[in-house]
């Protein structure tokens, strides 16, 4: 079974924060690579527990994925993002 998802990495002070917006998981590390590694570990542990409970497919559906053959694919796809600036009152 396969699942493709997005990872965002942010630097906050001396730490790096890795987020998966589609799955609503987050982790941190001292480096970008460590934060990503920790995030993968969190996702794997959570998915194993959900699979044992029989709730994994339901969770993925709530996160906006649907099962197609041997993969879960997003129902919607991010096509871009922008950094904008507005004037505050």
What are these regions (language model features)?
Residues 22-25, 78-80:
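Residue-level preference for alpha-helix termini and adjacent loops
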Residues 17-19, 28, 37:
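Short acidic, gly/pro-rich beta-turn/loop elements at beta-sheet edges
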Residues 1-4, 37-89:
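Short, charged, surface-exposed hinge/linker loops at domain edges
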Residues 3-22:
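Short aromatic-glycine-(Arg/Gly/Cys) micro-motifs in beta-strand/loop hairpins
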Residues 23-33:
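A short, exposed loop/beta-hairpin motif centered on an aromatic-Gly-Thr core
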